[in-house]
Amino acid sequence: MEQKRYALIVAGGHGLRMGADRPKQFLLLAGLPVLMHTLNRFAPHVDAIVLVLPTDHHAYWQELCRKYDFSVSHRVVAGGNTRFASVRNGLQVVPDGVLVAVHDGVRPLVSAETIDACFDLAELKGAVAPCRPMTESLRYYATDGNYAVDRSRYVTVQTPQTFRSEWLREAYRQPYEEYFTDDCSVYEHHFGRPVALIVGNIENIKLTTPLDLSLAKLLLTS
């Protein structure tokens, strides 16, 4: 029997690098706030959506939903001071025995194929992340200089990072460490085992700078 599928969308950033007058998840992209594009991408593929937002953004989000007549069903949960705390808060309303895909709210171009592939492999493996091969040259910085490294041995990791919900909740019970940069690092530190990887879609960029936003607009309208 197929497990139910949940999306846990984390949108706690303030977008300082974007240089805008509002958090980047609320910036307009092709006529809609970025975050609405993200929820729209997941809605056909999941049984429920949990949206984690800072408490001081809740009223503004409700206002945007009314303004844009946004009707995708979702539950809003209060975020924490860090991404780690925000995901942990979101997991409190996700039941055991389901698959949960944790996704950055400012990745609005994730494809249906990437979402489905993460869930499908998580049914078998229990822990999955999408990634992309490196295309730039890499160098390692050390105290005595810097050195070229073999880029074929490295990938960049995207979201949605998808897990059996009870596994991820258990991992998030451990104390926070500064090197927890994503859900995979939290999971691996707790269980001592790697996640499975799939190739994600190249358009699944995280909107961090004005250039990212311009590229996303081009991709959506081309």
Swiss-Prot record:
Keywords: Isoprene biosynthesis, Nucleotidyltransferase, Transferase. The keyword Glycoprotein does not apply. One of its GO terms (molecular function) is 2-C-methyl-D-erythritol 4-phosphate cytidylyltransferase activity. InterPro entries: IspD, IspD/TarI, IspD/TarI_cytidylyltransf_bact, Nucleotide-diphossugar_trans. The record marks R17, K24 as: Transition state stabilizer. It holds the Pfam family IspD. It catalyses: 2-C-methyl-D-erythritol 4-phosphate + CTP + H(+) = 4-CDP-2-C-methyl-D-erythritol + diphosphate. Pathway: Isoprenoid biosynthesis; isopentenyl diphosphate biosynthesis via DXP pathway; isopentenyl diphosphate from 1-deoxy-D-xylulose 5-phosphate: step 2/6. The keyword NAD does not apply. The record marks R151, K206 as: Positions MEP for the nucleophilic attack. One of its GO terms (biological process) is isopentenyl diphosphate biosynthetic process, methylerythritol 4-phosphate pathway. Coiled coil: none annotated. SUPFAM superfamilies: Nucleotide-diphospho-sugar transferases. Its EC number is 2.7.7.60. Belongs to the IspD/TarI cytidylyltransferase family. IspD subfamily. Catalyzes the formation of 4-diphosphocytidyl-2-C-methyl-D-erythritol from CTP and 2-C-methyl-D-erythritol 4-phosphate (MEP). This is 2-C-methyl-D-erythritol 4-phosphate cytidylyltransferase. It comes from Porphyromonas gingivalis (strain ATCC BAA-308 / W83).
